[in-house]
Design a protein with these regions (language model features):
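Conserved NTP-handling cores and scaffolds of large molecular machines
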Residues: 5, 26, 30, 135, ...
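Flexible, glycine/charged-enriched surface loops at secondary-structure junctions
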Residues: 11-16, 145-149
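Coiled-coil termination/hinge junctions
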Residues: 13-79
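Duplex nucleic acid-engaging cores and interfaces of nucleic-acid transaction enzymes
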Residues: 51-178
């Protein structure tokens, strides 16, 4: 009975992580704007075994172009980037953003990673508001009147070993309502 309990506890935890991952994919589908966005989502679904891989017999065909994160430039010149799917979120957070850039995400729900390129480590208050609004809009809570947004400098955001795309951990964060 004890071993059964341990095995079931482990399976329940794995299933919870799968649900979180699939929830983030569903949110990515909600905000996809192009065929290349959908292709990246399909690629992730195939990579993790949710759908079967279909091999293209037509050789020598051009690879589909990768979709890119949304890019916004504020009136005062701050660059804000928004990942549209889990692969983009990983790339944006761990390959593109630098340590002093600011990272935003909807608290405890699936959504896009939002990165504000920092000019000197600090941002004006209105940039925090804009980035928070983008993180709220590109999240599962996009239709809610208010969404709690966590934000922190990118150097405080970590990816656990073996974690699925888009999954991160962070601790000493700030929060705002957007």
């Amino acid at each position: 009975l004890k071993r059964t309990y341990q095995a079931l506890s482990s399976l329940i935890e794995e299933t919870k992580m799968e649900i979180i991952h699939l929830d983030s994919i569903a949110t990515s589908l909600d905000i996809a704007t192009s065929e290349s966005d959908l292709s990246q989502i399909k690629e992730e679904l195939m990579e993790y075994g949710y759908i079967k891989k279909h091999y293209d017999r037509r050789k020598g065909q051009k690879a589909q172009s990768k979709s890119k994160p949304f890019h916004y430039v504020t009136e005062d010149g701050y660059d804000i980037y928004v990942g549209k799917n889990n692969f983009q979120n990983d790339e944006l957070t761990f390959k593109f953003a630098t340590g002093n850039d600011w990272w935003f995400h909807a608290k405890k729900m699936a959504g896009s990673h939002v990165v504000v390129k920092s000019k000197d480590g600090e941002l004006p208050d209105h940039i925090f508001e804009i980035a928070g609004q983008l993180a709220a809009y590109y999240s599962k809570g996009r239709t809610a009147p208010k969404v709690e947004i966590d934000y922190i400098q990118k150097k405080q955001v970590k990816k656990p070993a073996g974690a699925k795309p888009g999954f991160v951990v962070y601790y000493t964060n700030y929060s705002l309502m957007a």
